[in-house]
C-alpha cells in the first residue's frame, strides 16, 4: 500500500497538498514511500491513542508510529485537527499552515528525526521551515 490519507472529521482539508508534503519530505530525506497512513482526526481519537500507546491522558497535535524495515518508509501518524485549530489561533497562523507544518513534522519523524531535546527540536523546526517554504513556493500558498 502506498501513501493513504484518511480524514475522520467533517472538516475539509487539502488532502492533495498534504500528500505532496509527505512525499516531498520522504523523497528529499532519502526515503522511498512504502506503506504510510496519515490519519487526520479529532481530540477524542488522538487522546485515546495517546493514552493507550504512550500512557499520556491528553490530546496532542500528532502521534507518529514508524515501522521502517529495509528500504521503504512505512508507518502511520495521527494528527488532531482540533489541536491544530487551537494551536493555529495560539500561534497566530492560518489553520492550513499549522496543519502543513505538523504534517511535515510527522513525516520527519517517519524519517527518524527526533524532538526530545531543545537542540533536536531546533534542527527539526529548521527542516519544517525548509519544506514549508518549498511547498508554499510550488503551490503559491
From Swiss-Prot:
The top EC class, named as a word, is: hydrolase
Q: Which residues does the annotation say bind Zn(2+)? A: 105, 109, 115
Name any one GO molecular function. Answer: RNA endonuclease activity
EC?
3.1.-.-
Source superkingdom: Bacteria
Assigned GO CC terms: cytoplasm
GO biological process terms, semicolon-separated: rRNA processing
Q: Which UniProt keywords apply?
A: Cytoplasm, Endonuclease, Hydrolase, Metal-binding, Nuclease, Ribosome biogenesis, rRNA processing, Zinc
Cofactors named for this entry? Zn(2+)
The cofactor note reads: Binds 1 zinc ion.
Which residues form each disulfide bond in the chain?
none
Query: Which Pfam families does this chain map to?
Result: YbeY (PF02130)
Alphabetical list of PROSITE patterns matching this protein: UPF0054
| Family stated for the protein in its record | Belongs to the endoribonuclease YbeY family.
- What is the stated purpose of this protein? Single strand-specific metallo-endoribonuclease involved in late-stage 70S ribosome quality control and in maturation of the 3' terminus of the 16S rRNA.
Q: Which PANTHER family match?
A: ENDORIBONUCLEASE YBEY, CHLOROPLASTIC
User: Cross-referenced HAMAP family, in alphabetical order?
Assistant: Endoribonucl_YbeY
What is the protein name stated in its UniProt record?
A: Endoribonuclease YbeY
Amino acid at each position: 500500500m502506498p501513501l493513504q490519507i484518511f480524514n475522520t472529521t467533517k472538516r475539509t482539508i487539502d488532502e492533495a497538498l498534504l500528500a505532496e508534503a509527505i512525499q516531498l519530505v520522504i523523497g528529499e530525506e532519502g526515503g522511498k514511500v512504502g506503506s504510510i497512513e496519515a490519519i487526520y482526526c479529532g481530540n477524542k481519537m488522538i487522546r485515546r491513542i495517546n493514552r493507550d500507546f504512550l500512557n499520556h491522558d491528553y490530546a496532542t497535535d500528532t502521534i507518529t508510529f514508524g515501522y521502517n524495515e529495509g528500504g521503504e518508509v512505512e508507518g502511520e501518524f495521527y494528527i488532531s485537527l482540533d489541536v491544530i485549530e487551537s494551536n493555529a489561533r495560539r500561534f497566530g497562523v492560518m489553520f492550513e499552515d499549522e496543519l502543513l507544518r505538523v504534517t511535515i513534522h510527522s513525516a520527519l519523524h517517519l524519517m527518524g528525526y527526533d524532538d526530545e531535546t531543545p537542540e533536536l527540536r531546533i534542527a527539526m523546526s529548521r527542516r519544517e521551515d525548509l519544506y514549508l517554504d518549498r511547498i508554499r513556493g510550488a503551490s503559491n500558498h
